[in-house]
């Protein structure tokens, strides 16, 4: 497999292996140079981060495996939540959901604009079969960690769209 820069740490390294790569721990601050010199062949980062950090200057292609799912979490102390009246809780919940939806929409727009920029710059953008990646990687995860997962966890993971 390719030498794929993954963050240091057991779980990140295992993720790289599960994707069929040779994971190479490289500090984020050293990634540009690692790509430039061939220490690594590729990287594992959102495309927007790749543009902001100018990794596209030393990268010719982007493969959108979408193997990490980002999500928003809105949290509030239970003491504060419990002190609210039901109508206040409902308003807070609605505002939180609206904020998360707007954040997701902005992220998706920024990602689409970044991918369009990469294509205009002559970069190749590939979108492989997500199910093939999931099946390949999931087998390794189930073998290594499956016995430690709560009952039904895999089904809930696979239900995410």
Predicted features and spans:
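N-terminal secretory/targeting leader peptides
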Residues: 1-161
